[in-house]
Amino acid sequence: AIIMDGNGRWAARRGLPRSSGHKAGVDALRRAVKAAADFGIEYLTIYSFSSENWSRPAAEVSFLLDLLRRFIRQDVAELHRSGVKITVVGSRADLEPGIVSLLDDAERLTRDNAKLNLIVAFNYGSRQEIARAVSAIAKKIESGELSAADVSSDVISCNLDTAGIPDPDLLIRTGGEQRISNFLLWQCAYTEFV
């Protein structure tokens, strides 16, 4: 798994606008996805847009959303031809319909691919994901579908956004910081950090 971090700091060190750092981050992502596929890695999860990113300046958020749109429009067909399956995790509630449609289309186009599973964490926050899982489990208990005594770590895992996706073996944070930033808190219980 990769926390895509440090784009703004990278740009600032070079006297460039933050937007240049974000563009360079997308280029690095392309290289990482290709390398993962070339090395036979089956799953790669990227933290592309945190649910906390909405608090950034509006112009930066708008630029990041435009980058996402461009990436999907320009890269998804090539990823599909390369056998990459795209799965998006995170909340789609309150996203503009155009973004939701692009995410849905990318998943639909690539759903039968199996060379590399690219999991894109977009509008993702792990605490919110865990809260959604707890809410789903509570509803199952309330409806009688599940008893409280049956709740286990496996039941929780099966109700997360990442249900069915293996926990990461390795977590890389590209910006050099040493924090997890509300990313895959449950899933990283036994993950190595770099």
Which stretches of residues belong to each language-model region?
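Flexible, compositionally biased loop and terminal segments
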Residues: A1-V194
